[in-house]
Amino acid sequence: FLYRKVVEGLPLDKVRVIMPTSPGLGFSSKIPASEHTVENHIRWINAVLNELELKELIYAGQDWGGPIGMGALSLSPSLLKGAVLLNTGFGAPITNVDLSPAHATVKTPVIGELITEVLFSMFDRLGNVQGDPESWTTEVAELYGKPLYDNGNAKAPLAMMRMVPDGPNHVSADAMRKIGDYVKTLDIPAEIVWGMNDPILG
């Protein structure tokens, strides 16, 4: 959904575009919060790649899609022929550090649930932290949140935020280091497209 306008500008008569939604988000099946791990997301997306029986692909990944997608491709390395990377990262921090004040706040048990599930919907507030707030209309915010609430996946955004490693000993750190090591071995055409107004990764 995030890249719907980008896809409209691609030569769809020449390329096949596949945009999987992360399991537990969108209209996918409900995933218990405890199952949102880097390893599981990698395994799930790799299963999608296998099911589609793809021969080769050019990968575009942003945010969590970067490491999860690369991790999935590390399990099927012959597929990857090129990459476009957008505001994402690979590897794990070598010191204790929070990605953002929001991540620092919601990682605390109970506090995170209170903020994201009781006090307000994070989708209603995302426009406040966008480089172009006008692009985040009420209708768009509702479309982002609707599948999560309709499918009982309201805990998924918080679980994904807590997956972000805040230090070398975080539960996600080992998987992220492996992804970073894999990326270092790649010798493929690649482009980096960076949005400087990204409030988290810009």
Descriptions of predicted regions:
Residues 25-55, 60, 64-202:
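Flexible "cap/lid" subdomain of the alpha/beta-hydrolase fold that forms the substrate-access gate
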Residues 1-27:
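Conserved HGGG/HGGXW glycine-rich cap/lid loop of the alpha/beta-hydrolase fold
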